């Protein structure tokens, strides 16, 4: 399976970027290319750890499509960042024995960008579009007949001499990935034959992912060390692999021993200010501010953002979700409140 990547981008209405965080599930610049992951990505469904129900559904769909000699139905994968949507698209292409052409919606700014991709597709190839919810209206309208009728409608000429020309396309599979399925237009969403959500990973699967990645990186970790990384990675394989690389760095410089144990993992991740539950400095700053200056809340988002020197959209989209997921923070009509669990984690007494 070959990967063909298109990475040109454009500005778009996204939440402002937060400062670089080792526990941020969004890809760092060095992780942006699918081909640059130290070979940690699985290549086949049998190597893909976790997401059991998703794998079962897709394995049946792939086998059926290959039996018919036809392209796989179009697939929409959605869920939080870092759970393996891009990896799954590449795995599907590998299972089908075809190329995976990789791009993202911001790279498809002009009509000719999407037209160029579509006309160069070979039969049954996979076209992967990341952040598909950010497609322009023009790009979406070009995709409608391509997905449904395997046809590209092109307008030739201008004004009164303009004519529409239909160009036949080979059978292909569009795999779209998004963290915001609700932001897709209904006409686009309805053209996907398979719509599947990726879930956060459990501790057992994450430990298996760390063990596999350690083997590929030629690192020796104890079972307890793998478990320690798995506990701190926020249920996200991308973060697990990133934390493993940071542990590798510390081990190669300070470790001395060839076997990495839980104590060394704790030392390395404490250096990066990632605690036993996966909270980093940004998470703790928010909770500490609420507790120390406001008695645990409630406090409005704008007030918190001003006190922390952060953009409100960044706090809401980047920092708060994991705290809400852990049950350390609540959003109420009057503002943000630290929960009893959040107080206990930071060593504060619970309210009477």
UniProtKB/Swiss-Prot annotation:
Biased composition annotated in UniProt, kind: Basic and acidic residues: 33-42
UniProt superkingdom: Bacteria
Keyword terms of this UniProt record: ATP-binding, Cytoplasm, DNA damage, DNA recombination, DNA repair, DNA-binding, Hydrolase, Nucleotide-binding
Residues reported to bind DNA: 331, 336
Coiled-coil spans in chain: none
Region named Small ATPAse domain (RuvB-S): 202-273
Catalytic activity: ATP + H2O = ADP + phosphate + H(+)
InterPro entries according to UniProt: AAA+_ATPase, AAA_lid_4, DNA_helicase_Holl-junc_RuvB, P-loop_NTPase, RuvB-like_N, RuvB_C, WH-like_DNA-bd_sf, WH_DNA-bd_sf
Region Large ATPase domain (RuvB-L), annotated ranges: 13-201
Record-listed ATP binding positions: 40-41, 82, 85-87, 191, 201, 238
Region (Disordered) residue spans: 1-42
Gene Ontology cellular-component terms listed: cytoplasm; Holliday junction resolvase complex
Gene3D superfamilies assigned to the protein according to its UniProt record, in alphabetical order: 1.10.8.60, P-loop containing nucleotide triphosphate hydrolases (3.40.50.300), Winged helix-like DNA-binding domain superfamily/Winged helix DNA-binding domain (1.10.10.10)
Annotated binding of Mg(2+), by residue: 86
UniProt GO molecular function: ATP binding; ATP hydrolysis activity; four-way junction DNA binding; four-way junction helicase activity
Compartment list: Cytoplasm
Any Gene Ontology biological process: DNA recombination
E.C. number: 3.6.4.-
Region (Head domain (RuvB-H)): 276-352
Pfam family, one: RuvB_N
Top EC category: hydrolase
Function: The RuvA-RuvB-RuvC complex processes Holliday junction (HJ) DNA during genetic recombination and DNA repair, while the RuvA-RuvB complex plays an important role in the rescue of blocked DNA replication forks via replication fork reversal (RFR). RuvA specifically binds to HJ cruciform DNA, conferring on it an open structure. The RuvB hexamer acts as an ATP-dependent pump, pulling dsDNA into and through the RuvAB complex. RuvB forms 2 homohexamers on either side of HJ DNA bound by 1 or 2 RuvA tetramers; 4 subunits per hexamer contact DNA at a time.
Family: Belongs to the RuvB family.
Comment text on domains: Has 3 domains, the large (RuvB-L) and small ATPase (RuvB-S) domains and the C-terminal head (RuvB-H) domain. The head domain binds DNA, while the ATPase domains jointly bind ATP, ADP or are empty depending on the state of the subunit in the translocation cycle. During a single DNA translocation step the structure of each domain remains the same, but their relative positions change.
Quaternary organization: Homohexamer. Forms an RuvA(8)-RuvB(12)-Holliday junction (HJ) complex. HJ DNA is sandwiched between 2 RuvA tetramers; dsDNA enters through RuvA and exits via RuvB. An RuvB hexamer assembles on each DNA strand where it exits the tetramer. Each RuvB hexamer is contacted by two RuvA subunits (via domain III) on 2 adjacent RuvB subunits; this complex drives branch migration. In the full resolvosome a probable DNA-RuvA(4)-RuvB(12)-RuvC(2) complex forms which resolves the HJ.
Name by which UniProt lists this protein: Holliday junction branch migration complex subunit RuvB
């Amino acid at each position: 399976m070959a990967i063909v990547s298109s990475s040109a981008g454009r500005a778009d209405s996204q939440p402002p970027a937060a400062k670089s965080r080792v526990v941020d599930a969004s890809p760092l610049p060095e992780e942006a290319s699918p081909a640059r992951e130290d070979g940690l990505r699985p290549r086949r469904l049998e190597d893909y750890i976790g997401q059991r129900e998703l794998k079962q559904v897709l394995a049946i769909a792939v086998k059926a499509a290959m039996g018919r000699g036809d392209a796989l139905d179009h697939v929409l994968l959605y869920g939080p960042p870092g759970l393996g949507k891009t990896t799954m698209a590449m795995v599907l292409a590998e299972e089908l024995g075809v190329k995976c052409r990789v791009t993202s919606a911001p790279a498809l700014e002009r009509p000719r960008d999407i037209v160029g991709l579509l006309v160069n597709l070979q039969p049954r190839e996979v076209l992967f579009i990341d952040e598909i919810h950010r497609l322009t209206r023009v790009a979406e309208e070009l995709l409608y007949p391509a997905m449904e009728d395997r046809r590209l409608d092109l307008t030739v000429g201008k004004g009164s001499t303009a004519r529409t020309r239909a160009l036949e396309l080979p059978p292909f599979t569009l795999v779209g990935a998004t963290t915001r399925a609700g932001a897709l237009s209904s006409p686009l969403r309805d053209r996907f034959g398979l719509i599947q959500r990726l879930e956060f990973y459990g501790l057992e699967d994450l430990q298996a992912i760390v063990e596999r990645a350690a083997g590929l990186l030629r690192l020796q970790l104890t079972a307890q060390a793998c478990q320690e990384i798995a506990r701190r990675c926020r249920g996200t394989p991308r973060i697990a692999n990133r934390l493993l690389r940071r542990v590798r760095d510390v081990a190669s410089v300070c470790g001395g021993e060839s076997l990495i144990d839980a104590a060394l993992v704790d030392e390395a991740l404490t250096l990066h200010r990632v605690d036993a539950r996966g909270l980093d400095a940004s998470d703790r700053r928010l909770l500490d501010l609420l507790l120390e200056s406001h008695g645990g809340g409630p406090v409005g988002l704008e007030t918190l953002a001003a006190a922390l020197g952060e953009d409100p959209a960044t706090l809401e989209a980047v920092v708060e979700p994991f705290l809400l997921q852990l049950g350390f923070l609540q959003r109420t009509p009057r503002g943000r409140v630290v929960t009893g669990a959040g107080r206990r984690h930071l060593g504060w007494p619970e309210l009477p």
